[in-house]
A protein has these predicted regions:
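Structured segments of extracytoplasmic/periplasmic soluble domains
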Residues: 9, 13, 51, 63, ...
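Secondary-structure end/capping motifs
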Residues: 155-233
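Short secondary-structure boundary/hinge segments and terminal tails
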Residues: 27-28, 45, 124-125, 142-143, ...
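Pocket-lining segment of extracytoplasmic ligand-binding domains
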Residues: 23, 94-95, 101-189
Length: 251
């Protein structure tokens, strides 16, 4: 399901949960009754992957880069990186692909010079002769993956939410403890080599957080980012967008 329609799908009752925290928080700020109940990562593994001919940031001027879309996490991270390396985004072309898999496909087919990717697509690209040019996922406070639920779901089906959270936390524990099996599953799921799956495993496990909570700094930082593009009340409490009462230790 396209990330952009997930908030409406959850309100309509077509799904019970979805994983994109940035999408969920953005929708909640816009007025939808959604809440973050679980966060997986300390930072996000977004990587700018390019052709081998790119040796310095300025080499990207006049080239095209694939991203999921405007105002998506890859877009925000890339804008922050451009600012860091002092490149104007107007000097670089963008291809909006609708998703990471499609961004990878655009890079692999040489429609673009670079793409903002996450594992396993960045590792898959490296195998095909591209290179990881820059980690961009640590430049902006943007929450990534976890669990978004509707407030109605939390209020009326708390047991289902609790069981889903517990199952996901158990899965993370299992992944940490079972490297060989996890790597094999990643390779089978994404049709990648064992070496690619190993690198993907290492990246994700290194970025898992320890308690399932979203740091207040990240939530506040993301609200500040949203304020750059639309009105967001200055007194909006970011902690009202989360409910971690069902995690171990409660609130």
């Amino acid at each position: 399901m396209n990330t952009g329609i997930q908030p409406q799908a959850i309100i309509a009752g077509n799904i019970n949960f979805f994983p994109s925290l940035s999408t969920g928080i953005s929708a909640a700020v816009a007025g939808l009754p959604l809440v973050v109940v679980l966060n997986f990562y300390e930072i996000t593994p977004w990587m700018l992957v390019t052709t081998k001919e790119i040796n310095k940031p300025q080499d990207l001027i006049g080239k095209k880069i694939a991203i999921s879309g405007i105002r998506t996490s890859p877009h925000y991270f890339l804008m922050a990186w451009f600012k860091k390396v002092e490149i104007s985004d107007k000097d670089v072309g963008f291809i909006m692909t609708g998703g990471t898999a499609s961004s990878f496909a655009s890079l692999a087919s040489q429609q673009v010079t670079g793409a903002v990717l996450t594992p396993p697509f960045d590792d898959k690209a490296v195998t095909r002769g591209f290179k990881k040019f820059a980690l961009v996922g640590d430049l902006v406070d943007i929450p990534t993956s976890g669990l978004i639920a509707s407030r109605q779901e939390v209020a009326n089906h708390r047991d289902r939410v609790q069981k889903t959270i517990d199952a996901l936390l158990d899965a993370v524990t299992w992944i940490r403890a079972n490297r060989v099996e996890s790597v094999r599953m990643i390779a089978d799921k994404f049709k990648i080599t064992s070496a690619e799956a190993e690198r993907t495993y290492e990246t994700y496990v290194s970025m898992f957080n320890k308690d399932g909570r979203l740091p207040p700094k990240v939530a506040r930082g993301y609200l500040d980012l949203l304020r750059q593009e639309r009105p967001v009340p200055a007194d909006l409490d970011s902690q009202k967008l989360v409910d971690f009462s069902m995690l171990p230790g409660g609130k």
